[in-house]
Each structure stands twice: as structure tokens, then as C-alpha cells.
Amino acid sequence: MQNVEFASLIVMAVAIALLPFAAMVVTSYTKIVVVLGLLRNALGVQQVPPNMVLNGIAMIVSCFVMAPVGMEAMQRAHVQINAQGGTNITQVMPLLDAARDPFREFLNKHTNAREKAFFMRSAQQLWPPAKAAQLKDDDLIVLAPAFTLTELTSAFRIGFLLYLAFIVIDLVIANLLMALGLSQVTPSNVAIPFKLLLFVVMDGWSVLIHGLVNTYR
């Protein structure tokens, strides 16, 4: 009995230690923070907003996006606890199984089918045949990397559109400086105020955050 409780304690400790990592790769955090980083680079202001602010914005928006999933997980865990008549260290695994289903549903909804198929094929090639035969495309071991890859692809597509909008300003400013004979002036330094002005006039923060949130409808 003590060995079982010790093993369950180890499993719970490992699960708690992996929570920050899981919060980054199996939530909306990855896409949001990458898009915000690409936006900062596109604007040409390398240190503003600072990394702490970007991470804070990404965490807050991710908490909003993931709130229904988290609440559903807590509700199912509560139902499991009531069914067990309480909980102790030996009943952690059934509790985790009940709580992970909402996350599986979220990942499955927002994961590209092509990426899931890739990891399923890779498992057939890399895993032992007996283990690969038991694998399903909605298992977390498949969904987690497929979701992360889907999010990164989506983030870079959004980043490309952001860069495309601001690079036009860079080109216009560079041509104007050359026409005025000011070739020694760095175009990027002159373009930054105009980029910021365009971003403010277009209500850029609201448009970008609203767009990111709406990708998870």
C-alpha cells in the first residue's frame, strides 16, 4: 500500500512540475506570444513592449480563451471526487483522467488534421508495433505536438501579414529619403514613428487581440 501511495505521489509531483510547460504548449499561449513577438519586430521597436509585458499579455488572453476549458475540467474533476466519496493520493489518476477530457476536446478542435495524420504515421514507423496499434488520433500524445505545430504555423501566417503591412511603410520611407538625397539617414529609424502612428490610428492592439481570440471560436 505504501509503495502504491509513493508511486502516486511521484506521478502527482511530476504532473505539477510539468504544468508550466503544458500551459505553454497545449494552450493558446504559444500562438499569442509568437504573434506579439513578430508584431514587435515588424514595428522595429525591439525592446518595447518588453518581454515581460508581452508574456503577461499572452498569459492574460490565454487565460480568457482557456477559461471555459479549465472550468469544464474542474467540474468533471469535482464530479469524479464526489463519485469517489472524496480523494486521496491513490485516486489521483482517475481524477486526472476526468479533468483532461476537456483539454483533449479543445486540442482536437483546433488541431490541423494533416498534423495529426503525420504524427500517427510517425508513430507507426518509430514506435513498437504493439504500442502503435493502440494509438488513436485523439490521444494527448498525438494531439499535443500536432496542436503546437498547428499553432506555430498559424502564428507565422499572421506574422507574415503584419510584416507585409509595415514593410510597405519601410519601402515608401526609403524611396522618399533617396529622392531627397538623404541616403545616409537610416530608413528604419524614420519609419518607426509612422508605423506607430498607423498602428494607433488603426486601433491595432484591439484589432489584433480580437482577431487572435476569435481564432478559437
UniProtKB/Swiss-Prot annotation:
Keyword field contains Transcription regulation: no
Major site of localization recorded for this protein: membrane
Annotated InterPro entries: T3SS_IM_P (IPR005838), T3SS_YscR-like (IPR005773)
Gene Ontology cellular-component terms listed: plasma membrane
Transmembrane region(s): 6-26, 52-72, 158-178, 190-210
Pfam families assigned to the protein according to its UniProt record, in alphabetical order: FliP
The keyword ATP-binding belongs to this UniProt entry's keyword annotation: no
Compartments where located: Cell membrane
Biological-process GO terms, alphabetical: protein secretion; symbiont-mediated perturbation of host programmed cell death
Disulfide-linked positions: none
Membrane topology field: Multi-pass membrane protein
Entry keyword set: Cell membrane, Hypersensitive response elicitation, Membrane, Plasmid, Transmembrane, Transmembrane helix
Superkingdom in the source lineage: Bacteria
NCBIfam families, A to Z: PRK12797.1, yscR
Function according to Swiss-Prot or TrEMBL: Involved in the secretion of PopA, a proteinaceous elicitor of the hypersensitivity response in plants.
Family under the similarity heading: Belongs to the FliP/MopC/SpaP family.
Protein name (Swiss-Prot/TrEMBL): Hypersensitivity response secretion protein HrcR
